[in-house]
UniProtKB/Swiss-Prot annotation:
Its main location: cytoplasm. InterPro entries: Dehydroquinate_synthase, DHQ_synth_AroB, DHQ_synth_fam, DHQS/DOIS_N, DHQS_C. Belongs to the sugar phosphate cyclases superfamily. Dehydroquinate synthase family. Zn(2+) binds at residues 185, 248, 265. GO terms for biological process: amino acid biosynthetic process; aromatic amino acid family biosynthetic process; chorismate biosynthetic process. It comes from Thermoanaerobacter pseudethanolicus (strain ATCC 33223 / 39E). Catalyzes the conversion of 3-deoxy-D-arabino-heptulosonate 7-phosphate (DAHP) to dehydroquinate (DHQ). It is found in: Cytoplasm. This is 3-dehydroquinate synthase. GO terms for molecular function: 3-dehydroquinate synthase activity; metal ion binding; nucleotide binding. Binds 1 divalent metal cation per subunit. Can use either Co(2+) or Zn(2+).
Length: 356
């Protein structure tokens, strides 16, 4: 089975790439966790599709499996839900050498990871992402969190998984909106780090949208390699890793202001990337031609490029609560050229100029 390794010294772990191979998961997971006692967390959308396949494979490998199914969507990513799951873990008899398996998209991965990070001060954790967004973003890098009503991912930890399993066959069950949400993050990697990935997406956009397996596998693996490289250089987001938040400053503000209901995460990031590029253009960091090229690709995918019914002053206030802002300064990830990004301090009035 194809895999790459995220290099974090003693916390290094593999990301496996497969197609319709859930039957092999039990034997793979067994290599990476300390005991056979495991707790699967999934949601009501994913449960009927993949739970039995995973459960069967784990039981063939003699795992003692317990599980919990939660409502799908961002509204489950709360302290209340985390507490409920932690109490279930205790009721099921999980010990310090037990493991948590996240079977689902980004929300499931985040809250399951948070449970694993906090239960008995941290237990083993396995990621099985079932959305394109989770496969290329939240399942890689060890950031786990829950939301507060006023902000996204405010309560969290860094807790690296023992392994990640990416099965591209699951993408065939996603609707187009979910595929596009993941594609937004993949485009982001090309913009901030490796412009050859951006060019590959430009040249193969229609095949990618048609879910051609070889094209999808290429951009997913490339995205994981890019994120893995950045994480290995800056695991705790002290400096470099912050560039992964490109598009997220305004994106998170839009999500919070709309109650996490109007836009899925990738859509908000797409809008955020457009505005981050407008800001870089206004500040003279990139030229018009480069801006138009990025805007055109995002538009061609069918992702949104603008928000509706929000006041720019409210967006700025939400941005001030962003984790990237420190000492009352607004920190923004901005482009400095093709495949180059950095965190820059930006004045409030500069942001207001580009917002509508």
């Amino acid at each position: 089975m194809d895999f790459i390794t995220i290099d974090l010294k003693e916390r290094s772990y593999p990301i496996y790439f497969a197609y319709d191979s859930f039957d092999k998961l039990g034997e793979i997971v067994k290599k990476h966790v300390r005991s056979s006692k495991t707790f699967i967390i999934t949601d009501f959308n994913v449960y009927p599709l993949y739970f039995e396949k995973l459960n069967e494979s784990l039981k063939k490998s003699r795992f003692d499996v317990s599980y919990e199914v939660i409502p799908a969507g961002e509204t489950s990513k709360t302290m209340e839900m985390a507490q409920r799951l932690l109490e279930k873990a205790y009721d099921y008899g999980l010990l310090r050498d037990s493991s948590v398996i996240a079977l689902g998209g980004g929300v499931v991965g985040d809250i399951a990871g948070f449970v694993a990070a906090t239960y008995m001060r941290g237990i083993d954790f396995v990621q099985i992402p079932t959305t394109l967004l989770a496969q290329v973003d939240s399942s890689v890098g060890g950031k786990v969190a829950v939301n507060l009503k006023k902000g996204k991912n405010i309560i969290g930890a860094f807790h690296q998984p023992k392994m990640v399993y990416i099965d591209t066959a699951v993408l065939n069950t996603l609707d187009k909106r979910e595929i596009l949400g993941g594609l937004a993050e993949i485009i982001k990697y090309g913009i901030i780090w490796d412009f050859s990935l951006f060019e590959y997406i430009e040249s193969n956009i229609y095949e990618i949208l048609d879910l051609e397996e070889d094209k999808l596998r290429h951009i997913i693996k490339k995205s994981c390699e890019i994120k893995g490289k950045i994480v290995s250089l800056d695991e705790k987001e002290e400096n470099l890793r912050s560039i992964l938040n490109f598009g997220h400053t305004i994106g998170h503000a839009i999500e919070a202001l709309t109650g996490y209901e109007r836009y899925i995460h990738g859509e908000a990031v797409a809008i955020g990337m457009v505005y981050a590029c407008k800001l870089a253009l206004n500040l003279g960091y990139i030229d018009e031609k480069y801006f138009e090229r990025i805007f055109s690709l995002i538009q061609r995918t069918g992702l949104p490029t603008d928000y509706e019914d929000l006041h720019k002053e409210d967006i700025v206030e939400a941005i001030k609560l962003d984790k990237k802002s420190r000492e009352a300064k607004i920190n923004f990830v901005l482009l400095r050229g093709l495949g180059k990004a950095e965190v820059t301090t930006v004045k409030e009035e500069e942001i207001l100029k580009v917002l509508k």
